[in-house]
């Protein structure tokens, strides 16, 4: 994917800048890589006053207001981190019947956009480049079915009420020393 960022006036008076994210398929609710790059550019171009040791920039992005922090050394950005919009889980262990795939278990969560998180092993596929086309096809089918049957509900941002994508994970690769409620 190719990403771009259009800098605009902020929506909120408490923000320094507004950002619209673009990519080869359209627009996005957010992009962490772009936030990091923009923070460096904004600070080092002199668009904001450098505050040593950390300069804060508040951005309005489609998913809400975020704060980025540039650690400064010799008037240069040494590192960047940011606080994203609040994230939350809408559903854990939900099951949906997907044509040609059968029953698929997923978690539905928001972290700047709604994503369905699916353990790839239940589909008898490995996360390997050789199976990329099959994985993409399955992701599209799962996204379509969930979008048809499940309402994504953001508590106060109605324009975020849609499924942005499917994230495949391989839970067999996760090693948790202390069992949690989800992985017992």
Q: At which residue positions do the language-model features occur?
A:
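Anion-binding (especially nucleotide phosphate/pyrophosphate-binding) glycine-rich loop
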Residues: 1-30, 34, 38, 156-173
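Single conserved hydrophobic/aromatic residue that forms the stacking wall/gate
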Residues: 174-184
């Amino acid at each position: 994917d190719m990403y771009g960022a259009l800098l605009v006036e902020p929506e909120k008076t408490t923000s320094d800048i507004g950002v619209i994210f673009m990519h080869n398929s359209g627009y996005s609710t957010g992009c962490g890589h772009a936030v990091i790059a923009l923070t460096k550019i904004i600070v080092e171009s002199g668009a904001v006053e450098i505050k040593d040791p950390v300069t804060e920039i508040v951005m309005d992005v489609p998913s809400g207001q975020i704060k980025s922090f540039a650690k400064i050394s010799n008037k240069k950005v040494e590192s960047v981190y940011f606080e994203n919009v609040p994230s939350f889980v809408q559903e854990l262990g939900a099951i949906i019947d997907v044509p040609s795939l059968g029953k698929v278990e997923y978690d539905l969560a928001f972290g700047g956009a709604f994503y369905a998180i699916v353990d790839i092993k239940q589909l008898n596929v490995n996360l390997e480049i050789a199976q990329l086309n099959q994985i993409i096809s399955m992701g599209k089918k799962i996204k379509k079915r969930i979008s048809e049957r499940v309402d994504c509900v953001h508590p106060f941002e109605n324009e975020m009420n849609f499924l942005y994508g499917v994230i495949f994970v391989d839970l067999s690769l996760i090693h948790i020393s202390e069992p949690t409620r989800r992985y017992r």
